[in-house]
Each structure stands twice: as C-alpha cells, then as structure tokens.
Regions:
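P-loop NTPase motor core
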Residues: 29, 101-182, 186, 337-421, ...
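Walker A/P-loop NTP-binding active-site region of P-loop NTPases
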Residues: 18-83, 87, 257-319
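Conserved nucleotide-binding/hydrolysis micro-motifs of P-loop NTPases
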Residues: 63-67, 75, 89-93, 134-136, ...
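Short glycine-/polar-rich loops that comprise or flank the Walker A/P-loop
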Residues: 26, 53-56, 81, 161-162, ...
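Conserved inter-motif catalytic segment of the P-loop NTP-binding fold
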Residues: 55-138, 294-372
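Flexible loop/N-cap segments at domain edges
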Residues: 249, 255-275, 280-282, 326-333, ...
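Short beta-alpha junctions and helix-cap segments that line functional grooves
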Residues: 46, 71-74, 169, 173-177, ...
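Conserved P-loop NTPase
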Residues: 1-2, 6, 114, 123, ...
Length: 481
C-alpha cells in the first residue's frame, strides 16, 4: 500500500498511465538509455508540458549547447518558449588551462554540483532537467566519490520546490547502478535493432520509491511532434458488461456448420492455404456485424485497403464498401514498421474509442514476424484474447498454412487458446479444384462435423452439401474434429 503522494504529469499521457499518475513531486528521477533512445526528447516533452501549465521550467545542459538543444526542439516542431535553458561547463576554460595532468577532481566535482544547485535555486524552477550526468561522472575519481556527490546534490535539491529529471547514458561497465540507487525513480529506455524494418523502442520503470507503477517493458515510438507510449496490456484491468451481442454471419448454412452465431467475447481462428477464402469468410462476419449496427475493427497485415474493399463489393453487397455510418474501421498494418505494443494499442483504441464489437486480424502469420524474436506469441495473444473477451468483443484471427493442422507449430499453435476453429482446404475431384470448409472446434457448444463445399459467388458465400467423394480423393484428408 502506498501513501498518498502528489504526482507531476510528464506530458505523455500513456507514460503517466505506466507511472500511475506521473513523476513524484519534489523528487529526483533518472531517465537512462544509450545514445539515440530519446532521453533528451522525453526531457523536453516534460518541460514543455510544464511550461504550458504556467510552471517555471529549467533545462540545464552540461553537454550540448543552447543552439543544439533548440535545433532538437525544432526538429519535433516544438517551441521552448517559457523554458529557461542554461549551459554549465563542467570544466570552465580558465580552469582547464591552469590544470596539470594531476586534476583536483574533488574540487572540480564539488564546484560543479554547487553550480547546478545554485542555478536551480536562482531560477526558482518547478521542473528541472539536467543533461547529462555523464559529464558529472567523468569528474569523479572513483565510484564512492561519484555516489557521495550525487547524494549531496539530491539533498540540496530537496530544499527546493522542484521535480528534477536527470538524463544519463547507459554504460557497458554497469556504473549506472551507482546513480540508480541514489535517486527516487528510474526509467530505462532501450532501442532494439531488427534484422529488417524499423528499430523497436521500449521502456520500463525500474523503480519509483514510495509510489506504484506498472512493471514490465512498454513499447514506445518517437514521431515528429510527439512521443507515444504503449502500455503493456493487463486484461484483468478492463471489463465491459453492457450490450452483449453474438455475431452471426447472416449465412444460415455457415452458422449451422459452426454451431450457431459466434458467442460474444469468443475467439475464432480461420485457417487454410492461400486463396482458399479465409478473408472472404471473415469479411462476411464483418458485413453482418456492420449491418446489425456494430462497429468492426479490421486489421490487415497483407492486403491494401482498396483490395479488401473491392473484395467486399465483388463477393458481397455494395453497402459494406460504402459504409455510410462509418462502422467498418479498416487499418492497414505494416509489420516491418510497428511494434507488438503499438499494434495491441491500436486494437484497444478501436475497442475503447469506437466501441467495436468485432475485431479481425488478417493475417496472424505477418504478426508473427513482428514478435517472433520475443518468443512470446501465445502469452501476448492469450492476453489480447482475454482483454477482448472481458470487453465482450468477438475476435476472428486468420492464419495461413498449407498442410494439416499442427498445433506444435505457428500459427496453428494459436488454435490451442482460441475458442473456435474453422478450417478451409482445397480438394481435387475429376480434375477440378474445389474449396472445402469445416468446423474443427467450438468450445461453448456443438458444431457439425461434415466437410462441405465452399462457393465464393457474386452473391456472396454459399455453403454446399456434404462432400461425398471418397476421402482419399480429397486433398484434405484426416480432419480433426
């Protein structure tokens, strides 16, 4: 249990959510990370928000010039009006010229700490950023000396009405722990290079003395004029109990095959080879949901918006493509430019901001490429399915494969945690390739076990009769039931 403490918003709402309200007022916090992770950008965002609310803000730079800092702000389209920017040289030129090879580090470091404290006291700032502690560390003769000076600085700052953010570079020798233990809060920024596509950025709160926070890694992105943080999903924190709706396909034979309408909050996986009709079946459910007045979120990793909408016109009704009520929310996702956290955040926004009752992911194979390096597909998807279930949102996940369902391999492994499975296949009969469909699983009820013909016509989807040819003439033998 944590005592009531006053929080200071960072200017990044989602980061404040991770921090359970923001930084702790009148405390010293550390933002650390390797060069290029966005420490300066985050520090500027913190001060800009303070200045916008009328607070006195101070940026103390020990490494960059004022002009360089202003250029960084301009690159994001930001103005530093209302923010005092002061340069403090760790070693003044007149002092440096008088030094011998034996530097009196005790005097220099103590003087630097004193100058920092004096500048903050003089400004009367309520928000302070000090960039960067690397310059301070370089003046320390050893770790104990550095730690003593940091504690001295922290004690001096405690006399002021200021919430201070220190910026520091992570080092290979592990010396960042010296600073971590001396401050009240620590946020670590990390940038991971991928074999192809954009680098992935993520952050975590290491500690927040006296305050609660959401632990774990959270993806973030730096855009031209803002920083976006995507808090990791905790399904149990979300629930929506109103307006429970099952999802019918509006195709009687398809509903009968899968055992009725898809239950509200259930997850369904549609699997099959390329071109077998997976997306078309999913779009049929989307069309039915839109016609019933529900909002639908459709996330496409593979096909363009124009291709999907033309397919809706070709196989379904024109009304679905025009969608005058704007209930069909189609988003094209580039798997090489998005992080797992950002994708889940997009799903949440469709559900929470638009009130979507059906979410379709097409297809999961491309999403696998986004998170393959984490080796946590089942954990992340299970959390997403749990969240959607708690929000009474029905989900459909499309997975492409060319062989029999194999739950030991991706993406078929997802079938273990989904509630329903619809399988599509090709089969050859009398030198003609046909499409087949069957239901393999329904967790909350019974379903048909017949393999039936699937037709994609100008009028829409049609489910034919049970396929009566011998099994060895069908290219989809050994269906699981």
């Amino acid at each position: 249990m944590h005592l009531d403490i006053e929080r200071i918003p960072t200017g990044i709402p989602e980061l404040d959510a991770v921090l359970r309200g923001g930084l702790i007022r009148q405390r010293v916090h550390l933002i650390e990370g390797r060069p290029g992770t966005g420490k300066t950008t985050l520090g500027l965002r913190y001060l800009i928000h303070g200045a916008s609310t009328g607070q006195r803000c101070l940026y103390l730079t020990l490494s960059e010039s004022r002009e360089e800092l202003l250029a960084t702000a301009r690159s994001h389209g930001w103005s530093l009006d209302g923010i005092a920017v002061e340069e403090i040289m760790p070693l003044p030129p007149e002092t440096a010229s008088a030094q011998t090879i034996l530097l009196p580090t005790d005097t220099e470091l103590s003087a630097l700490v004193g100058r920092i404290a004096d500048q903050i006291a003089k400004s009367g700032a309520e928000r302070v950023v000090i960039d960067s502690m690397v310059e301070v560390r370089l003046l320390a003769r050893d770790s104990p000396h550095y730690r003593r000076q940091i504690i001295d600085l922290r004690q001096r700052l405690a006399r002021f009405d200021a919430t201070v953010v220190l910026l520091d570079d992570l080092t290979a020798d592990g010396r960042e722990y010296e600073l971590q233990s001396a401050v009240h809060g620590v946020v670590t920024l990390e940038q991971l290079e991928r074999s192809f596509g954009a680098a992935r950025r993520r952050l975590r709160v290491v500690k927040l003395r006296g305050g609660d926070f959401q632990s774990g890694w959270h993806d973030y992105a730096i855009q031209k004029n803002e920083i976006l943080v995507f808090p990791s999903l905790i399904a149990q924190e979300h629930r929506r109990d109103d307006d429970v709706r099952d999802m019918s396909s509006n195709v009687e034979s398809l509903d009968r095959l899968v055992g009725g309408a898809l239950s509200a909050g259930s997850s369904t996986m549609i699997v099959g080879p390329s071109g077998s009709g997976k997306s078309t079946v999913a779009l049929q459910y989307a069309l039915a949901a839109v016609e019933s007045g529900c909002h639908v979120g459709y996330f496409s990793f593979d096909e363009s918006e124009s291709t999907l909408r033309s397919r809706m016109v070709e196989h379904m009704h024109q009304d679905a493509a025009t969608d005058e009520q704007r209930r069909f929310h189609l988003q094209r996702i580039n798997p090489s430019r998005i992080s797992p956290g950002e994708f889940i955040w997009k799903v949440r926004r469709i559900v929470e901001d638009r009130g979507a009752r059906l979410v379709i992911i097409d297809c999961i194979n491309s999403y696998l490429d986004v998170i393959r390096e984490e080796k946590s597909l089942l954990l992340q998807m299970n959390e997403l399915f749990s969240y959607l279930s708690n929000m009474n949102v029905t989900s459909i996940i499309i997975g492409a494969h060319s062989a029999r369902l194999d739950t030991s391999k991706e993406p078929d492994a997802l079938s273990i945690i989904t509630d329903n499975i619809i399988s599509l296949r090709y089969y050859e009969h009398e030198n003609v390739v046909h499409k087949a469909i069957c239901a393999l699983k329904r967790r909350d009820g019974r379903h048909e076990h017949d393999v039936r013909e699937l037709y994609l016509t100008d009028a829409g989807i049609e489910i034919g009769e049970r396929i009566a040819v011998p099994v060895d003439e069908i290219g989809v033998a050994n269906f699981d039931s």
